[in-house]
Curated annotation (Swiss-Prot):
Taxonomic lineage of the native organism: Eukaryota, Metazoa, Chordata, Craniata, Vertebrata
Disulfide bonds: none
Ranges per topology, Extracellular: 96-99, 284-295, 724-728, 796-802, 864-876
InterPro entries found in the cross-reference section: ATPase_P-typ_cation-transptr_C, ATPase_P-typ_cation-transptr_N, ATPase_P-typ_cyto_dom_N, ATPase_P-typ_P_site, ATPase_P-typ_TM_dom_sf, ATPase_P-typ_transduc_dom_A_sf, HAD-like_sf, HAD_sf
Protein's name in the database: Calcium-transporting ATPase type 2C member 1
Length: 919
């Protein structure tokens, strides 16, 4: 006899050995062997002393969450951002150079950014403690011969646990008693159909398939039907549920594309800043200037070139995106996640509960005499109709249909109360059908005399009943189950009220109809009735399906059209998976489907080569999903994973963005996810992708504005310094320009409304820097116009070679007006300001008006004139400056027009793009 594999832990006090059995091994052993190995008493349970001893070694039946780091450490960790570190260095240098105004402004900017990021992370990132919510707070346990209520966390290996309908299994159990037990394991395995449980030893499948362990009740699963007793074999992290937990802890979440872009931008800015320092120092040294003086000037210029407002605008832009997503019933747990969806090009979606409702529904009826009926409505309720040849059938109006409904209703243990199912989903679908026909009261009209419960071996259920008002008549037998099994007990079939002999021709006809319904993704049940099991009359077939969610097909179509590939990953059969995928538009003639077993045999390298053409993965487990996602990421794809069950949790965390269902999603799933869809609406993902693309565009708009302004200011001061010109701007004027650069006008660019055309554009490549060649060109063009225009005004005013307050006021105001027009043209990289609407962004309008009012106060308000060393300008001066500075906006509009014309020409000349599956 094989020796059980288990871990032996010595008990110090009584020198006994406490074993730890895996569910795979326990399922192969007889109950007596398991009890012997666990030193357990199945009937009387453990005594309290033994429970204490075992808990000392096994711990509590809960998950070991590592202690969270202190808040101060979390706060300090925010400073590790490259841009923040660069700003800190700038602030320190400013203090050393006694430029306290810059030092204060930079320090305040740092504190704002860090605090906002810290608060957001603190509120949104919960620890994995939410996992414990899946474990019920109480359970029924036998100890010292008594049945008692105890906390689930108190259980230890060897405890005897009692289960009944509605209970959530508190630990992994080896069942030793089971009466018509059916457990919903969809949250763990992805299988929609509840698993029938037995007590006999079951050889475990070689691939470790949990569904093959039919004598094991797994932690976190739900008892749908029957009752049972089991012995605890695994608690906490030693359970199968705990394995998922450990996989989650081991998986590190990848950096988001925005984080990568910001890191790259920080490095680029550092490189450019130090490059400027080196060049200015070298040129100054060659010109014979004092090296220390040149170093001071160079560092000042480098500090001025760093856009310290960038982290603030990025944070604010993302936060506003999160707020907009909340209004659309989506909770984003981390700020950069919304933007990540903007470059997502693959969505891996679980079928059950995500693309479908996880509510079995009858959609088609075939009577034994060939009559077809369509059933409308979805879910466990009375809303819907049964339609035959265009007419609505109700009650006993159509006997052929009514008899099928009657059999399905009477041969049934499920109950629907307040639209909530208590029982098996398949039986719930039949009760809902009866409710639509007004026949659900038939269950109470019959008295059940005998019952033949459903089992996975026989694949049918039957009952013997008598009508309450006709108890003196012979018993009637009703049967439902798989067609291949039910037909064996049938000798006749119903044809327009007459009972006719069941011929081979009729059997072949029913077989064809059954196959046709199955190919459409329907689960087919046959129903029959008669005086005895061997003398049944076939009544007909019903087709049941887990229907797609409302609006999913439309969302899928839009996403595919925008260049996003969608792959369905499910534990269902190939036939069902392909049928659902076809209905949703995910599966075409050129698509491929791959099983979980095939995924097992492939290396990630091989899988990454075929995965672009695969639309459906069936019979997939959590480890398969992980492998699929890794293969997609190996191809450079940005992967989003949607799901609602425990089986999705690891993949949700491994994906670039995990999306959980809020209503049907398990707590472990929600904690692993980056975004939660409150209403389980798949369409919200499309809105999130649109939001993500819009957010990235807004960030690019801000970067364009701020860098062009920074470069212009840097170039202006550098030229004046190198050419021994008087400084065209004084310190306070430069500070005011910096406030405008990083203040309301700049930040209002981050709240620009999302362009409705953005969803039609393909996902961007996450490898691309935020500073693309096109953006750099636009930045340089704007900078050159600003520098040339400002120098022209300075040269025009400085004809006597004596600098006066008027000279600096004209130059200063010219630069500020250039800033305002530059901000206006930066609102969109592709559309004209008139096309997007001058007042479509009210915050921008208020910010620009406020800045102009502030500039006028600086020019005309005497106290501020002294501070900024300015003087009043005439109306002609202002009109001249407005005309000159508007050139930066006019040139930008011309560039946009040229780009749109070129893009339109390219679209007309290029061929049709390849299939969306070629990701």
């Amino acid at each position: 006899m094989k020796v059980a594999r288990f871990q032996k832990i010595p008990n110090v006090e009584n020198e006994t050995m406490i074993p730890v059995l895996t569910s795979k091994r326990a399922s192969e052993l007889a109950v007596s062997e398991v009890a012997g190995l666990l030193q357990a008493d199945l009937q009387n349970g453990l005594n309290k002393s033994e429970v204490s001893h075992r808990r000392a070694f096994h711990g509590w039946n809960e998950f070991d969450i590592s202690e969270d780091e202190p808040l101060w450490k979390k706060y300090i960790s925010q400073f590790k951002n490259p841009l923040i570190m660069l700003l800190l260095a700038s602030a320190v240098i400013s203090v050393l150079m006694r430029q306290f105004d810059d030092a204060v402004s930079i320090t305040v900017a740092i504190l704002i950014v860090v605090t906002v990021a810290f608060v957001q992370e603190y509120r949104s990132e919960k620890s994995l403690e939410e996992l414990s919510k899946l474990v019920p707070p109480e359970c029924h346990c036998v100890r010292e011969g008594k049945l008692e209520h105890t906390l689930a966390r108190d259980l230890v290996p060897g405890d005897t646990v009692c289960l009944s309908v509605g209970d959530r299994v508190p630990a992994d159990l080896r069942l030793f008693e089971a009466v018509d037990l059916s457990i919903d394991e969809s949250s763990l395995t992805g299988e929609t159909t509840p698993c029938s449980k037995v007590t006999a030893p079951q050889p475990a499948a070689t691939n470790g398939d949990l569904a093959s362990r039919s004598n094991i009740a797994f932690m976190g699963t739900l008892v749908r039907c029957g009752k049972a007793k089991g012995i605890v074999i695994g608690t906490g992290e030693n359970s199968e549920f705990g394995e998922v937990f450990k996989m989650m802890q081991a998986e590190e979440a990848p950096k988001t594309p925005l984080q990568k872009s910001m890191d790259l931008l920080g490095k680029q800015l550092s490189f450019y800043s130090f490059g400027i320092i080196g060049i200015i120092m070298l040129v100054g040294w060659l010109l014979g200037k004092d090296i220390l003086e040149m170093f001071t000037i160079s560092v000042s210029l480098a500090v001025a070139a760093i856009p310290e407002g960038l982290p603030i605008v990025v944070t604010v832009t993302l936060a506003l995106g999160v707020m907009r997503m909340v209004k659309k019933r989506a909770i984003v747990k981390k700020l950069p996640i919304v933007e990540t969806l903007g470059c997502c090009n693959v969505i891996c979606s679980d079928k059950t509960g995500t693309l479908t409702k996880n509510e079995m529904t009858v959609t088609h009826i075939l009577t034994s005499d060939g009559l077809h009926a369509e059933v409308t409505g979805v879910g466990y309720n009375q809303f819907g109709e049964v339609i035959v040849d265009g007419d609505v059938v109700h009650g006993f109006y159509n006997p052929a249909v009514s008899r099928i409904v009657e059999a399905g209703c009477v041969c049934n243990d499920a109950v629907i109360r307040n639209n909530t199912l208590m029982g098996k989903p398949t039986e719930g679908a039949l009760i809902a059908l009866a409710m639509k026909m007004g026949l659900d009261g038939l269950q109470q009209d019959y008295i059940r005399k005998a019952e033949y419960p459903f089992s996975s071996e026989q694949k049918w259920m039957a009952v013997k009943c008598v009508h309450r008002t006709q108890q003196d008549r012979p018993e009637i037998c009703f049967m439902k189950g798989a067609y291949e099994q039910v037909i064996k007990y049938c000798t006749t079939y119903n044809s327009k009220g007459q009972t006719l002999a069941l011929t081979q021709q009729q059997r072949d006809l029913y077989q064809q109809e059954k196959a046709q319904m199955g190919s459409a993704g329907l689960r087919v049940l046959a129903l029959a009735s008669g005086p005895d099991l061997g003398q049944l009359t076939l009544l007909g077939l019903v087709g049941i399906i887990d229907p797609p969610r409302t609006g999913v097909k439309e969302a899928v179509t839009t996403l595919i059209a925008s260049g996003v590939s969608i792959k369905m990953i499910t534990g269902d059969s190939q036939e069902t998976a392909i049928a659902i995928a076809s209905r949703l538009g995910l599966y075409s003639k050129t698509s491929q489907s791959v099983s979980g077993e095939e995924v097992d045999t492939m290396e990630v390298q091989h899988l990454s080569q075929i995965v672009p053409k695969v639309a459906v993965f069936y019979r997939a487990s959590p480890r398969h999903k992980m492998k699929i996602i890794k293969s997609l990421q190996k191809n450079g794809s940005v992967v989003a994973m949607t799901g609602d069950g425990v089986n999705d949790a690891v993949a949700l965390k491994a994906a670039d963005i995990g999306v959980a269902m809020g209503q049907t999603g398990t707590d472990v799933c929600k904690e692993a996810a980056d975004m939660i869809l409150v209403d389980d609406d798949f369409q919200t993902i499309m809105s999130a992708i649109e939001e993500g693309k819009g957010i990235y565009n807004n960030i690019k708009n801000f970067v364009r504005f701020q860098l062009s302004t920074s470069i212009a200011a840097l170039t202006l001061i550098s030229l004046a310094t190198l050419m021994n010109f008087p400084n065209p701007l004084n310190a306070m004027q430069i500070l005011w320009i910096n406030i405008i650069m990083d203040g309301p006008p700049a930040q209002s660019l981050g709240v620009e409304p999302v362009d409705k055309d953005v969803i039609r554009k393909p996902p961007r490549n996450w490898k691309d820097s935020i500073l693309t060649k096109n953006l750099i060109l636009k930045i340089l063009v704007s900078s050159i116009i600003i520098v040339c225009g400002t120098l022209f005004v300075f040269w025009r005013e400085l004809r006597d070679n004596v600098i006066t307050p008027r000279d600096t006021t004209m130059t200063f105001t010219c630069f500020v007006f250039f800033d305002m027009f530059n901000a206006l043209s930066s609102r969109s990289q592709t559309k004209s300001v008139f096309e997007i609407g001058l007042c479509s962004n009210k915050m921008f309008c208020y910010a620009v008006l406020g800045s102009i009012m502030g500039q006028l106060l600086v020019i005309y308000f005497p106290p501020l004139q002294k501070v900024f060393q300015t003087e009043s300008l005439s109306i002609l001066d202002l009109l001249f400056l407005l005309g000159l500075t508007s050139s930066v906006c006019i040139v930008s509009e011309i560039i946009k027009k040229v780009e749109r014309s070129r893009e339109k020409t390219q679209k007309n000349t290029t061929s049709t793009p390849s299939s969306f599956l070629e990701v």
